[in-house]
Amino acid sequence: MFNNNLVLYLENQKSQSMKNQIKIFFLLTFLCTSFLFSQSEVKPPKGYSNDIGNMISMLDNLKKRVERHVRNLDQEGTDYLLDENANSPGAIIFHLAATEAYYQVYTFEGRSFNAEERAKWEMALNLGAEARKQFKNKPIKYYMDIYDEVRAKTKALLKTKDDEWFKKKIGSMTNHWAWFHVMEHQANHMGQLALITKRI
């Protein structure tokens, strides 16, 4: 009789444990799914027109994903060159900032870089052999701070515009297409950074 009761008790405990595990599994699944969907929503932040806000949402999402590949790099990783013609992760982040800075003056002021801006951004914009010599021995934070500063300016400038401005043509492209290009440019280099950082 005692043995039967013990068996029944153990089976009941086992069943209860299984039920708890199932509950935990579904709870974790729900939380993970909710997190993934919340991260994947394109939604205009407060203060922006609809189309510009959607672009900001995508730009910022991509920027976070770019930075995920590099934020923990040490100095060796920041300056790492995949081969003699490659660009380092630090240089690529600088390049992303320079490209975005260029499209700021192009879309908001209708011009190219002036002499002072060229001195600041041209090497990072074009990269190449001289950039490989110059862009080293600085921590990844140095480059990420530059990127942050440029993005903050982009967002402040875009907040002053509306979707009618976004549709306007400037040169051979609309303002919308220009900022789409900035976004796809980030995506291109995100893949490059993913490859490079796996080789470090």
Predicted regions and their residues:
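Hydrophobic core segments within long, regular secondary-structure runs in both alpha-
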Residues: 63, 67, 147-151, 155
